[in-house]
C-alpha cells in the first residue's frame, strides 16, 4: 500500500530490505553479503533509471512463476532501451538469491574463521554464474528488438513487435543453450515465452482502451 504512493525507487529499497531481513533470519553472514550487493545495485540503478524500479522487483518475482520474459517484451513495448539496466539488475538479484539459497546449509555451520572463505566462495559462484550474462544479454536484445519494431511507421507495429520479441527470446535462449550449456529449461522457456506474449497482447489491448477513453 505504501509503495502505491511512493516512487519506484522506494519500492526497490523496501523490497531489498525485506529480502535482507529474511536472509538474516537464516544466516547473518549471508544477509551481510546480500546487503553489500544490494547497495551496489541500488546505487547503480538510482544513477541511470530510478523511474523503472518495478522492473528490478518484477523479474525475480516473475522468474519464480517461469514468466520473466514478459518484462523485456513489455519494456520494449511501453518504455525505451534504458530499461536494459534495471532488467539486468533484476536478473542479478534473482540469481544471487538462488546462489545464497544453495549455500544456506553450509553457512550455518561456519565459525568466525570461516567467514572470509565463505564470502569468497559465494562471490566466486556469483561471478562464475554465466546465466546472469546470458539472460541479461537476451533480455537486452529483446528490449531493443521490440522497441525498434514498435517505432516503425507501419500498421500493427506493436503487435508485430510482441511477436518479434517472443521469437527473438526463444531463439536467443536456444542458441545460448546450445553454445554455452545454460541451466535454462527449454520447454519451460518456450511455454513461458508464449504466456508472456499473450499477457503482452492483453496489456496492449487495455492500454489502447485506456488511451481511447482518455481521448474521449
Language-model-derived ranges and their functions:
Residues 8-13, 27-34, 50-54, 69-72, ...:
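Short, aromatic-rich membrane-interface segments at the entry and exit
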Residues 22-36, 128-137:
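Structural signature of hydrophobic alpha-helical transmembrane segments
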Residues 202-216:
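Membrane-interface capping segments at transmembrane-helix boundaries
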Residues 1-16, 23:
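Hydrophobic transmembrane alpha-helices
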